[in-house]
Amino acid sequence: MYNILKKSFYKQKSLDVASSLLGKMLLFNQHKGIITETEAYIGQDDQAAHSFHGYTKRTAVMFGNPGFSYVYLIYGMYHCLNVVTEPEGFPAAILIRSIILLSKNTPHTKVNGPGKICKILHITKEHNNIDMTANHSFCICDTNLNIDDYICTPRIGISKATDKFWRLVIPNVTSLQYIDTKLVCTLT
């Protein structure tokens, strides 16, 4: 059994959560993937965040409990998975931008882009506002990976608040191996 990240993990400052999510395992039904890239959207002052325009039906989950999923549709066709961070009442979420999809039967596949992740895993708006700290089929779990080597860059695909270096990426991920239920990450 995997150790699901607790609400206290997500209740921290968003940039701390964004960096700590690197190397953690996203579980969705039968799919498993190691998170290799995240992006933070923090508060009502962040012009690129959905919460910038305040509390709405769409953004209500961002103002809610930490550790809940925030799934929305962009361009009318791509779903994006975020996890809510910070204490309840402060709107913030971390976008999962890239994973290494783990499979025992096929080579591990790097999945770049939040829309691709949701398409491959079959995550839709139906999976919005789910407590990922209490759901064994849709959660993020701890691993034995300690990722200290990551880079911060400007966020991608936005036109406002482009000066924020809130995209966190594990550089040069070359392979992930699944060995006796323990994960080993090889970085170059």
From Swiss-Prot:
Biological process annotations from GO: base-excision repair
Broad EC category: hydrolase
Alphabetic keyword roster: DNA damage, DNA repair, Hydrolase
Pfam families assigned to the protein according to its UniProt record, in alphabetical order: Pur_DNA_glyco
Coiled-coil blocks: none
EC number: 3.2.2.-
Disulfide cysteine pairs (residue numbers): none
Hydrolase found in the keyword field: yes
A molecular function (GO) term: DNA binding
Keyword match Transferase: no
NCBIfam families: 3mg, PRK00802.1-4
Family: Belongs to the DNA glycosylase MPG family.
Protein name per Swiss-Prot or TrEMBL: Putative 3-methyladenine DNA glycosylase
Species annotation: Ehrlichia ruminantium (strain Gardel)
